[in-house]
Amino acid sequence: KQSFVGYEGRRIRGIGRPHKVDRQEMVGVVAAVRHWMTINHEERLASIEERSGRIIKILGGMEGVEVSMIDNIIGHQPFGVQLRVDEKITGVSLHDIVDKLKAGDPPIWTRVREEEDFMALHIFGLKEGEEEIVGSRIAELLR
């Protein structure tokens, strides 16, 4: 009996116990894949584009601030907002904005990648309405 189980077990190199994956994680993966395969992606992307536009509307027209829509349709984050600030005009740098957003209530975590002169704000991790909180908080820092 033991030699049969040992022999059969050697050939199993899949997901599950050998990789310390439990039932809950497997159910979670199945649920996530089912959700992804049945979601209306056109509606999902249209909503993200619209919500990105809300941030642009809040920040657009501010002196020393340039905002534009990220429309990388072939990327994994197809929509979002690209924010540039002229520190001489606004008196605040992108790195200052990152630090102040992080220290605020609620904390908002953003970043400016090394060698880039803009902040990319992606909407996918935000709940409906939170894009307005992010846009308003950034606008407060730039006034």
Regions from the language model: what does each represent?
Residues 1-76:
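Active-site C-terminal subdomain of aminotransferase-like
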Residues 56-140:
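Conserved C-terminal alpha-helix-loop-beta "cap" of PLP-dependent enzymes
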